[in-house]
């Protein structure tokens, strides 16, 4: 149920079914570097992915207008091998905020729809496993100390 609790500064989305267990999802509206709107998409939350947003190659093509030079592409180490990622600048809109982000896709292979820690660490997120909700909370006021 998107927008659940929106009056309280909270946006929530239901987990998606997985093969064995459901997994958390977030919905973001994406724009390329020219600020052309791609639209709103659902992305699987992946805390094991250190990067920003990964998309399949076909979807990444929309963002190629902001692609960085090859010397700035990133390489990640997986259990099996290393993966080189093409990287493009973009803007993500989530919970009323616009964030400058990078979109990645594997140089070889298909890619997936993921949101990784580079973006997640910039948001206040609640993963409510028992209720199968993923929520973005309102940003904490400046100067507030959560302790």
State where each predicted segment sits.
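Pepsin/retropepsin-fold aspartyl endopeptidases
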Residues: 1-147
């Amino acid at each position: 149920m998107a927008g659940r609790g929106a009056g309280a500064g909270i946006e929530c989305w239901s987990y998606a079914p997985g093969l064995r267990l459901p997994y958390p999802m977030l919905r973001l509206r994406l724009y390329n570097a020219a600020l052309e709107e791609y639209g709103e998409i659902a992305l699987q939350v992946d805390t094991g992915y250190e990067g920003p947003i990964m998309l399949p190659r076909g979807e990444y093509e929309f963002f190629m207008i902001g692609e960085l030079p090859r010397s700035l592409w990133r390489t990640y180490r997986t259990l099996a091998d290393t993966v080189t990622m093409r990287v493009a600048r973009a803007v993500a809109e989530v919970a009323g905020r616009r964030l400058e982000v990078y979109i990645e896709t594997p140089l070889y292979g298909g890619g997936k729809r993921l949101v990784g820690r580079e973006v997640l660490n910039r948001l206040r997120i609640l993963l409510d496993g028992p209720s199968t909700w993923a929520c973005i909370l309102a940003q904490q006021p400046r100067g507030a100390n959560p302790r």
